[in-house]
Amino acid sequence: MTANVYALVAAAGSGTRLGFDTPKAFVELNGRSLLERSLDGLAASQSIEETIVLVSENMRDHAERIVNDPINVAEWAPMTVSVELGGGERFDSVYAGLVAIQRRLSAADEAPEGRFVAVHDAARCLTPPAMIAEVVDRARRGVADGSWYGAIPVLPVVDTIKVIDAPTSGPRAGQTVVEQTPDRASLRAAATPQVFDLGKLIEANEQYLRTTEISSAHAVDRVGASPLPLVTDDASLMEMAGFPVVAVDADPLAMKITTAQDYRVAQMILNGSEG
């Protein structure tokens, strides 16, 4: 039987900024990998039925061992977890996950309509289950009456943000020049999981590929630098396609572990909650 709510966990990143030789998703945090902790949260939310982990080729066996570990399988049940090969860029990985979901649905002679997908980063492994459930619920509410087609968690921007430019000619050539200061009251930092109507996210991805004249099959196979315009989250694709998405206040624990400093902060949080 196919799922009504899927999750895709992006875990193919190298994590060089974190300072470990191991890819970021597989770095241990207080004895449990970031990937396992992110799956713990998805399962505990009781909102996700099936999760697909997207990894690089060299970490596929490691990921398979993690998701097939009997203790993990029991811990995450009834949510099921499987592994698929991701891509060179985040977009490629998520698109590969969407293709995998479509294969499952086609095999069962079912369609994407009425289903949802939550796209999550393994690096946001402390995201509270209650927040995940709230984002899924908000997406469901909008799709039910066609008011919106997805929901994303967002965090306030506390710093003053500057738009900059780097002119290559003129008196300021070689300098970083401040162009403008947007009002931070209207700015938010996007977090994950981002939850969408499955059919609409597939459509948004296909529109993006058509716009850039890249075939779907080529997109799945690409490795390395992408010729596509940079897309750093899935809500951006929904925006481009004209599908409304609403924002949900995120819990600060939905922080992304990217640098060594982030890692130390996460350790302190866990030491306080698990001690």
UniProtKB/Swiss-Prot annotation:
The gene is ispD. GO terms for molecular function: 2-C-methyl-D-erythritol 4-phosphate cytidylyltransferase activity. It catalyses: 2-C-methyl-D-erythritol 4-phosphate + CTP + H(+) = 4-CDP-2-C-methyl-D-erythritol + diphosphate. One of its GO terms (biological process) is isopentenyl diphosphate biosynthetic process, methylerythritol 4-phosphate pathway. The record marks R17, K24 as: Transition state stabilizer. Keywords: Isoprene biosynthesis, Nucleotidyltransferase, Transferase. Its EC number is 2.7.7.60. This is 2-C-methyl-D-erythritol 4-phosphate cytidylyltransferase. InterPro entries: IspD (IPR001228), IspD/TarI (IPR034683), IspD/TarI_cytidylyltransf_bact (IPR050088), Nucleotide-diphossugar_trans (IPR029044). Pathway: Isoprenoid biosynthesis; isopentenyl diphosphate biosynthesis via DXP pathway; isopentenyl diphosphate from 1-deoxy-D-xylulose 5-phosphate: step 2/6. The keyword DNA-binding does not apply. The record marks R184, K256 as: Positions MEP for the nucleophilic attack. Transmembrane segments: none annotated. Belongs to the IspD/TarI cytidylyltransferase family. IspD subfamily. Catalyzes the formation of 4-diphosphocytidyl-2-C-methyl-D-erythritol from CTP and 2-C-methyl-D-erythritol 4-phosphate (MEP).
